[in-house]
Amino acid sequence: MDKFKEIRPIVLGIAKNNNRLLVSEGYDKVKDSTFYRCLGGGIEFQEKSYEALKREFLEEIGKEISVKDFLGVSENIFTFEGKKAHELIFFYSAELKEEDYQEEYVMDEDGKVNKAVWIDINEFKSNKSIVYPTEVLKYI
């Protein structure tokens, strides 16, 4: 089934360090808009959300995390590159091991190379930079 025509369960990790949030950069060509999103991804059938978060961090940046507190669930109905989407998002606080902190991480997702970076939380709170879903702002 087309992932844009179903409700997709995902999990996102709120990883903070020195008032900075670990995010990956995204770009919507239709809106000509750059945005940021916390790391995480889809929850597979019969997979616990916190297990999916650990798997996603390992897949995305090659680092193990400690999943800390469950922060909440949010429903996200949005349009990305002209396509309507619907997500049910589980939020957790997450921590990397001290020795695994880097200024940026190279991400390779299915051949698409991107990077994860630490952005000052005030950039998002002051609306200088956009973080999606906006519910992230409640947890930072």
Stretch-by-stretch model annotation:
Residues M1-L22, K68:
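Conserved N-terminal beta-strand and adjoining loop/helix that marks the start
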Residues R8, K16, S33, C38, ...:
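Short connector loops at helix/strand junctions that flank enzyme active sites
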Residues A15, F91-E95, D120:
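Short, well-ordered beta-strand micro-motif
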Residues R20-E59:
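Conserved Nudix-box catalytic region and its N-terminal flanking loop in Nudix hydrolases
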Residues L21, E87-I89, A116:
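Structural motif
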Residues E64-V73:
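A short coil-to-beta-strand element that immediately follows conserved catalytic motifs
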Residues F78-E103:
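Active-site-adjacent beta-strand/loop module that shapes the phosphate/pyrophosphate-binding cleft
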Residues E104-Y139:
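NUDIX/MutT-family hydrolases
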